Protein backbone atom coordinates (compact mmCIF):
# COMPACT_ATOMS: atom_id res chain seq x y z
CA UNK A 1 0.00 0.00 0.00
CA UNK A 2 1.19 3.48 -0.82
CA UNK A 3 1.04 6.05 1.97
CA UNK A 4 1.72 9.18 -0.06
CA UNK A 5 -1.47 10.85 1.20
CA UNK A 6 -3.21 9.87 4.45
CA UNK A 7 -6.23 11.32 6.22
CA UNK A 8 -6.27 10.93 10.00
CA UNK A 9 -9.83 11.25 11.31
CA UNK A 10 -10.38 11.31 15.08
CA UNK A 11 -13.41 11.32 17.36
CA UNK A 12 -14.40 14.90 18.13
CA UNK A 13 -15.17 14.53 21.84
CA UNK A 14 -12.16 12.36 22.75
CA UNK A 15 -8.90 13.80 24.05
CA UNK A 16 -7.14 10.40 23.75
CA UNK A 17 -8.19 10.20 20.10
CA UNK A 18 -6.84 13.70 19.46
CA UNK A 19 -3.50 12.80 21.08
CA UNK A 20 -3.22 9.61 19.03
CA UNK A 21 -4.07 11.57 15.88
CA UNK A 22 -1.18 13.95 16.51
CA UNK A 23 1.18 11.01 17.09
CA UNK A 24 0.01 9.20 13.94
CA UNK A 25 0.46 12.36 11.89
CA UNK A 26 3.98 12.81 13.27
CA UNK A 27 4.99 9.23 12.43
CA UNK A 28 3.47 9.35 8.95
CA UNK A 29 5.11 12.68 8.11
CA UNK A 30 8.44 11.17 9.15
CA UNK A 31 7.85 8.55 6.44
CA UNK A 32 7.23 11.26 3.86
CA UNK A 33 3.42 11.09 3.84
CA UNK A 34 1.23 14.11 3.22
CA UNK A 35 -1.13 14.04 6.22
CA UNK A 36 -4.46 15.78 6.74
CA UNK A 37 -6.11 15.55 10.18
CA UNK A 38 -9.74 16.28 10.97
CA UNK A 39 -12.20 15.56 13.76
CA UNK A 40 -15.52 13.83 13.24
CA UNK A 41 -18.58 13.60 15.44
CA UNK A 42 -22.33 13.97 15.75
CA UNK A 43 -22.14 17.71 15.02
CA UNK A 44 -18.91 17.73 13.01
CA UNK A 45 -18.75 16.19 9.53
CA UNK A 46 -15.36 16.80 7.88
CA UNK A 47 -15.86 14.63 4.80
CA UNK A 48 -17.79 16.92 2.41
CA UNK A 49 -15.17 19.62 2.93
CA UNK A 50 -12.23 17.24 2.57
CA UNK A 51 -13.61 15.64 -0.57
CA UNK A 52 -14.34 19.03 -2.11
CA UNK A 53 -11.03 20.77 -1.29
CA UNK A 54 -8.38 18.06 -1.50
CA UNK A 55 -6.83 17.83 -4.96
CA UNK A 56 -6.23 14.08 -4.67
CA UNK A 57 -7.92 11.33 -2.70
CA UNK A 58 -5.92 9.70 0.09
CA UNK A 59 -4.30 6.29 -0.14
CA UNK A 60 -5.62 5.54 3.35
CA UNK A 61 -7.96 6.96 5.98
CA UNK A 62 -6.92 6.24 9.57
CA UNK A 63 -10.00 6.50 11.80
CA UNK A 64 -9.45 6.87 15.56
CA UNK A 65 -12.58 6.49 17.66
CA UNK A 66 -15.39 4.02 18.14
CA UNK A 67 -17.78 2.29 15.77
CA UNK A 68 -19.80 5.47 15.28
CA UNK A 69 -16.76 7.32 13.96
CA UNK A 70 -16.02 4.43 11.61
CA UNK A 71 -19.60 4.30 10.34
CA UNK A 72 -19.53 8.01 9.54
CA UNK A 73 -16.28 7.60 7.62
CA UNK A 74 -17.55 4.60 5.67
CA UNK A 75 -20.69 6.41 4.52
CA UNK A 76 -18.58 9.06 2.79
CA UNK A 77 -15.42 7.19 1.77
CA UNK A 78 -16.70 3.85 0.52
CA UNK A 79 -17.98 5.26 -2.77
CA UNK A 80 -14.43 6.45 -3.49
CA UNK A 81 -12.87 3.04 -2.60
CA UNK A 82 -10.71 4.68 0.07
CA UNK A 83 -9.34 2.02 2.48
CA UNK A 84 -10.20 2.59 6.13
CA UNK A 85 -7.91 1.56 9.00
CA UNK A 86 -10.03 1.83 12.15
CA UNK A 87 -8.60 1.86 15.67
CA UNK A 88 -10.62 1.95 18.87
CA UNK A 89 -9.62 5.07 20.79
CA UNK A 90 -12.32 6.35 23.12
CA UNK A 91 -14.99 4.00 21.74
CA UNK A 92 -17.09 1.34 23.43
CA UNK A 93 -17.72 -2.07 21.83
CA UNK A 94 -15.41 -1.53 18.88
CA UNK A 95 -16.82 -4.22 16.57
CA UNK A 96 -15.28 -2.54 13.53
CA UNK A 97 -12.00 -1.42 15.05
CA UNK A 98 -8.55 -2.71 15.93
CA UNK A 99 -7.32 -2.57 19.49
CA UNK A 100 -5.48 0.62 20.38
CA UNK A 101 -2.33 -1.37 21.09
CA UNK A 102 -1.59 -1.68 17.35
CA UNK A 103 -0.44 1.96 17.49
CA UNK A 104 2.51 1.20 19.75
CA UNK A 105 5.66 1.79 17.71
CA UNK A 106 5.78 2.49 13.98
CA UNK A 107 5.50 -1.18 12.93
CA UNK A 108 1.92 -0.58 11.80
CA UNK A 109 3.01 1.74 8.98
CA UNK A 110 5.77 -0.60 7.82
CA UNK A 111 3.27 -3.44 7.64
CA UNK A 112 1.04 -1.36 5.42
CA UNK A 113 3.94 -0.30 3.21
CA UNK A 114 5.01 -3.96 2.90
CA UNK A 115 1.44 -5.08 2.06
CA UNK A 116 1.21 -7.17 5.23
CA UNK A 117 -2.52 -6.77 5.68
CA UNK A 118 -5.84 -7.99 4.29
CA UNK A 119 -8.75 -6.01 2.90
CA UNK A 120 -12.31 -6.77 4.03
CA UNK A 121 -15.17 -5.68 1.80
CA UNK A 122 -18.28 -4.85 3.82
CA UNK A 123 -21.68 -4.64 2.13
CA UNK A 124 -23.52 -1.32 2.40
CA UNK A 125 -27.13 -0.24 1.87
CA UNK A 126 -28.61 2.74 0.09
CA UNK A 127 -31.96 4.35 0.87
CA UNK A 128 -33.78 6.57 -1.61
CA UNK A 129 -36.81 8.59 -0.53
CA UNK A 130 -39.49 8.87 -3.22
CA UNK A 131 -41.68 11.93 -2.63
CA UNK A 132 -43.47 11.78 -5.99
CA UNK A 133 -47.23 11.70 -6.19
CA UNK A 134 -49.12 8.59 -7.30
CA UNK A 135 -49.71 10.23 -10.69
CA UNK A 136 -46.01 10.95 -11.15
CA UNK A 137 -45.11 7.36 -10.27
CA UNK A 138 -47.66 6.08 -12.78
CA UNK A 139 -46.07 8.21 -15.50
CA UNK A 140 -42.48 7.22 -14.60
CA UNK A 141 -42.50 3.90 -12.71
CA UNK A 142 -38.81 3.14 -13.30
CA UNK A 143 -36.75 2.53 -10.14
CA UNK A 144 -34.84 5.48 -8.73
CA UNK A 145 -31.20 5.58 -9.75
CA UNK A 146 -28.31 5.25 -7.31
CA UNK A 147 -26.18 8.42 -7.36
CA UNK A 148 -22.43 8.48 -6.80
CA UNK A 149 -22.63 10.96 -3.91
CA UNK A 150 -24.87 11.42 -0.89
CA UNK A 151 -25.69 15.00 -1.77
CA UNK A 152 -29.33 15.64 -0.90
CA UNK A 153 -32.18 14.79 1.46
CA UNK A 154 -33.40 11.88 -0.66
CA UNK A 155 -30.29 9.65 -0.91
CA UNK A 156 -28.55 8.03 2.04
CA UNK A 157 -26.04 5.24 2.69
CA UNK A 158 -25.48 2.99 5.70
CA UNK A 159 -22.90 0.41 6.70
CA UNK A 160 -24.88 -0.92 9.67
CA UNK A 161 -28.57 -0.31 9.09
CA UNK A 162 -31.50 1.88 8.23
CA UNK A 163 -34.53 1.95 10.47
CA UNK A 164 -37.88 3.70 10.36
CA UNK A 165 -39.83 4.75 13.45
CA UNK A 166 -42.79 6.98 14.24
CA UNK A 167 -41.96 10.67 14.41
CA UNK A 168 -43.84 12.34 17.25
CA UNK A 169 -42.40 14.28 20.16
CA UNK A 170 -45.38 14.47 22.50
CA UNK A 171 -46.20 10.73 22.76
CA UNK A 172 -44.52 7.38 22.27
CA UNK A 173 -46.57 5.99 19.38
CA UNK A 174 -46.63 2.92 17.24
CA UNK A 175 -46.70 3.09 13.46
CA UNK A 176 -47.90 1.00 10.54
CA UNK A 177 -45.47 0.29 7.71
CA UNK A 178 -46.23 -1.60 4.52
CA UNK A 179 -43.31 -3.72 3.34
CA UNK A 180 -42.91 -4.46 -0.35
CA UNK A 181 -40.15 -6.81 -1.57
CA UNK A 182 -39.37 -6.97 -5.29
CA UNK A 183 -42.76 -5.52 -6.18
CA UNK A 184 -44.80 -7.78 -3.87
CA UNK A 185 -46.44 -6.58 -0.66
CA UNK A 186 -45.43 -9.10 2.01
CA UNK A 187 -46.52 -7.48 5.30
CA UNK A 188 -48.14 -4.52 6.99
CA UNK A 189 -46.18 -4.15 10.20
CA UNK A 190 -47.72 -2.40 13.16
CA UNK A 191 -45.32 -1.77 16.00
CA UNK A 192 -42.41 0.47 16.92
CA UNK A 193 -40.81 0.39 13.47
CA UNK A 194 -38.68 -1.59 11.05
CA UNK A 195 -34.93 -2.25 10.73
CA UNK A 196 -33.12 -3.05 7.48
CA UNK A 197 -29.64 -4.25 8.28
CA UNK A 198 -26.46 -5.42 6.60
CA UNK A 199 -24.51 -8.40 7.98
CA UNK A 200 -22.19 -5.87 9.62
CA UNK A 201 -25.15 -4.31 11.42
CA UNK A 202 -26.73 -7.64 12.37
CA UNK A 203 -24.95 -7.56 15.75
CA UNK A 204 -26.45 -4.15 16.58
CA UNK A 205 -30.03 -2.87 16.67
CA UNK A 206 -31.30 -5.75 14.54
CA UNK A 207 -29.94 -8.27 17.04
CA UNK A 208 -31.68 -6.45 19.90
CA UNK A 209 -34.91 -6.69 17.88
CA UNK A 210 -34.59 -10.47 17.67
CA UNK A 211 -32.75 -10.74 14.37
CA UNK A 212 -30.05 -13.29 13.51
CA UNK A 213 -26.29 -12.80 13.52
CA UNK A 214 -24.97 -12.85 9.94
CA UNK A 215 -21.31 -13.37 9.14
CA UNK A 216 -19.97 -10.30 7.27
CA UNK A 217 -18.72 -12.60 4.52
CA UNK A 218 -22.36 -13.05 3.49
CA UNK A 219 -24.16 -10.47 1.39
CA UNK A 220 -27.79 -10.32 2.55
CA UNK A 221 -30.31 -7.92 4.08
CA UNK A 222 -31.96 -8.51 7.46
CA UNK A 223 -35.52 -7.16 7.72
CA UNK A 224 -36.44 -6.99 11.42
CA UNK A 225 -39.69 -5.53 12.83
CA UNK A 226 -39.26 -3.56 16.06
CA UNK A 227 -41.66 -4.80 18.76
CA UNK A 228 -44.41 -5.86 16.32
CA UNK A 229 -47.97 -6.12 17.63
CA UNK A 230 -48.58 -9.33 15.68
CA UNK A 231 -46.88 -12.71 16.08
CA UNK A 232 -46.95 -13.10 12.29
CA UNK A 233 -44.57 -10.18 11.69
CA UNK A 234 -41.21 -11.91 11.85
CA UNK A 235 -37.63 -11.19 10.91
CA UNK A 236 -36.67 -12.33 7.41
CA UNK A 237 -33.37 -12.44 5.55
CA UNK A 238 -33.54 -11.53 1.86
CA UNK A 239 -31.00 -11.71 -0.98
CA UNK A 240 -28.69 -8.73 -1.48
CA UNK A 241 -30.29 -7.81 -4.81
CA UNK A 242 -33.75 -7.50 -3.27
CA UNK A 243 -35.49 -4.15 -3.65
CA UNK A 244 -37.39 -3.17 -0.52
CA UNK A 245 -39.99 -0.42 -0.46
CA UNK A 246 -41.46 0.82 2.83
CA UNK A 247 -44.68 2.85 2.85
CA UNK A 248 -45.95 4.72 5.93
CA UNK A 249 -49.67 4.10 6.38
CA UNK A 250 -52.23 6.20 8.25
CA UNK A 251 -53.46 9.77 8.42
CA UNK A 252 -51.41 12.82 7.55
CA UNK A 253 -50.01 13.19 11.08
CA UNK A 254 -48.52 9.67 11.02
CA UNK A 255 -45.08 10.77 9.93
CA UNK A 256 -42.09 8.41 9.94
CA UNK A 257 -38.45 9.26 10.60
CA UNK A 258 -35.67 7.49 8.69
CA UNK A 259 -32.40 6.81 10.50
CA UNK A 260 -29.04 5.65 9.11
CA UNK A 261 -26.47 4.03 11.41
CA UNK A 262 -28.20 5.71 14.35
CA UNK A 263 -28.16 9.18 12.76
CA UNK A 264 -31.40 10.91 11.76
CA UNK A 265 -31.87 11.38 7.99
CA UNK A 266 -35.26 12.73 7.04
CA UNK A 267 -39.01 12.48 7.65
CA UNK A 268 -41.53 10.68 5.43
CA UNK A 269 -45.18 11.61 5.09
CA UNK A 270 -47.95 9.09 4.28
CA UNK A 271 -47.97 8.68 0.50
CA UNK A 272 -44.19 8.88 0.29
CA UNK A 273 -41.98 5.80 0.38
CA UNK A 274 -38.43 4.70 1.12
CA UNK A 275 -36.60 2.39 -1.30
CA UNK A 276 -33.76 0.37 0.23
CA UNK A 277 -31.35 -1.82 -1.69
CA UNK A 278 -27.72 -2.88 -1.76
CA UNK A 279 -25.33 -0.06 -2.59
CA UNK A 280 -23.06 -0.46 -5.59
CA UNK A 281 -19.96 0.06 -3.47
CA UNK A 282 -18.51 -1.72 -0.43
CA UNK A 283 -16.64 -0.32 2.55
CA UNK A 284 -12.95 -1.24 2.26
CA UNK A 285 -11.72 -2.13 5.76
CA UNK A 286 -8.02 -2.77 6.41
CA UNK A 287 -7.47 -5.87 8.54
CA UNK A 288 -4.13 -6.16 10.37
CA UNK A 289 -4.85 -9.20 12.53
CA UNK A 290 -2.99 -12.23 11.23
CA UNK A 291 -5.65 -14.70 12.37
CA UNK A 292 -8.91 -12.74 12.57
CA UNK A 293 -11.91 -14.59 13.99
CA UNK A 294 -15.39 -13.12 13.65
CA UNK A 295 -16.72 -15.61 16.20
CA UNK A 296 -14.07 -14.65 18.73
CA UNK A 297 -14.99 -11.00 18.23
CA UNK A 298 -18.69 -11.71 18.78
CA UNK A 299 -17.92 -13.81 21.86
CA UNK A 300 -15.74 -11.12 23.44
CA UNK A 301 -17.87 -8.08 22.54
CA UNK A 302 -21.30 -9.60 23.28
CA UNK A 303 -20.14 -12.09 25.94
CA UNK A 304 -21.47 -14.83 23.65
CA UNK A 305 -19.76 -17.92 25.03
CA UNK A 306 -22.58 -20.22 26.08
CA UNK A 307 -21.37 -23.26 27.98
CA UNK A 308 -17.74 -22.17 27.51
CA UNK A 309 -18.19 -20.13 30.67
CA UNK A 310 -18.68 -23.31 32.67
CA UNK A 311 -16.25 -25.72 31.01
CA UNK A 312 -13.10 -25.76 28.94
CA UNK A 313 -13.66 -26.28 25.19
CA UNK A 314 -12.60 -29.59 23.73
CA UNK A 315 -9.51 -29.89 21.57
CA UNK A 316 -11.40 -31.65 18.78
From Swiss-Prot:
It catalyses: NAD(+) + ATP = ADP + NADP(+) + H(+). InterPro entries: ATP-NAD_kinase_N, ATP-NAD_kinase_PpnK-typ_C, NAD/diacylglycerol_kinase_sf, NADK. GO terms for biological process: NAD metabolic process; NADP biosynthetic process. Its EC number is 2.7.1.23. GO terms for molecular function: ATP binding; metal ion binding; NAD binding; NAD+ kinase activity. One of its GO terms (cellular component) is cytoplasm. It comes from the Bacteria. Its cofactor is a divalent metal cation. The active site is at 67 (proton acceptor). The keyword Transmembrane helix does not apply. NAD(+) binds at residues 67-68, 160-161, 190, 192. It is found in: Cytoplasm. Residues 132-151 are annotated as: Disordered. Its main location: cytoplasm. Keywords: ATP-binding, Cytoplasm, Kinase, NAD, NADP, Nucleotide-binding, Transferase. The keyword Zinc-finger does not apply. Involved in the regulation of the intracellular balance of NAD and NADP, and is a key enzyme in the biosynthesis of NADP. Catalyzes specifically the phosphorylation on 2'-hydroxyl of the adenosine moiety of NAD to yield NADP. Belongs to the NAD kinase family. NCBIfam families: PRK02645.1 (NF002731). This is NAD kinase 1. It comes from Parasynechococcus marenigrum (strain WH8102). The lineage of its organism: Bacteria, Bacillati, Cyanobacteriota, Cyanophyceae, Synechococcales. The gene is nadK1.
